[in-house]
């Protein structure tokens, strides 16, 4: 399941980074938040960290953009997740 979520998260973040003004941005952001809640419910805060670490590096390599600001979209899911 995590592999599918990772690919979906990767695609969503790439889309949001490259298209910040599109009409469906809020829908995409909402799905990113939902993925975070699913990961946390399944595997805890470590899963959030591991997933985002992997995604950040992939995005940096592929499009040269920093995904770290998008970590804040998962704030409020876990008390230990504060970005």
Give, region by region, the residue ranges found by the protein language model:
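Amphipathic alpha-helical coiled-coil segments
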Residues: 34-50
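Generic detector of low-complexity/intrinsically disordered segments
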Residues: 7, 11-15, 41, 50
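Amphipathic alpha-helical binding modules
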Residues: 50-83
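Charged, low-complexity interaction regions
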Residues: 14-26, 43-45
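Short, flexible coil/linker elements and helix-boundary hinge sites characteristic
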Residues: 19-20, 30, 40, 64, ...
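Amphipathic alpha-helices that form helix-helix packing interfaces
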Residues: 9-12, 32, 39, 55-58
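Short amphipathic alpha-helical heptad-repeat segments
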Residues: 1-13, 25-31
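Generic alpha-helical structural signal
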Residues: 1-4, 26, 42, 49, ...
């Amino acid at each position: 399941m995590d592999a599918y979520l990772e690919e979906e998260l990767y695609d969503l973040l790439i889309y949001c980074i490259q298209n910040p003004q599109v009409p469906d941005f809020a829908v995409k952001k909402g799905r990113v938040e939902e993925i975070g809640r699913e990961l946390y419910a399944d595997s805890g805060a470590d899963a959030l960290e591991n997933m985002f670490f992997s995604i950040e590096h992939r995005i940096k390599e592929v499009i040269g953009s920093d995904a770290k600001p998008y970590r804040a979209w998962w704030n409020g899911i876990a008390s230990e997740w504060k970005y």
